[in-house]
Amino acid sequence: MAMWIGALVTYTIVRAVPARSLTARTPSWRVLVQGLAPGLLVGVVQAVILAIIAHTVLDLPLLDFAPLLSLLLFAAATFAAVTFALTAWLGGAGRVLGVALVVAAVAGRAVSAVPAWFETIAPVLPLTPAMNGVAAFAAGAPGVGAAVGGLLGWLVLGLAASYAAVVRSRMAGSRGLARLSRSGA
């Protein structure tokens, strides 16, 4: 949850697709990488801190640190891509949706008497595979592989939606410039 909130706050402070990139000659994939960088940086820092805390609190064997950190880094990259896409496509509404997703994920974990419709959507929330993976890892139970698969699905979806948002934003910027040049402004 902390990494999701970190990514969400990052794209509240930093614009997902900077205005200067709308008309730059830089390829869209590079604009995407530059846009994802702040969220990834925050996520990496959070993942390292969380791995150290979890390793210490759970008294995990030293050999478990690298796999736990890898899972958290993968979750951080996934969260950065999904929150980038939400804010790039929907702006403020995407941020609100991001907050709603974290609230739903927390409610699904904390409240045992959730409505039936919620139990239907909870497994497909982007935070669910990360929380399931960390819980499985901490308990030494199976489920980490399924969690990685779920995160991979969300990562691919997040990157595709993010790239499409960058392309759309840049096309809108070109159209806006074309309108300005036609109007003589």
Which residues does each predicted region cover?
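Membrane-spanning alpha-helical segments of multipass transporters and channels
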Residues: 1-185
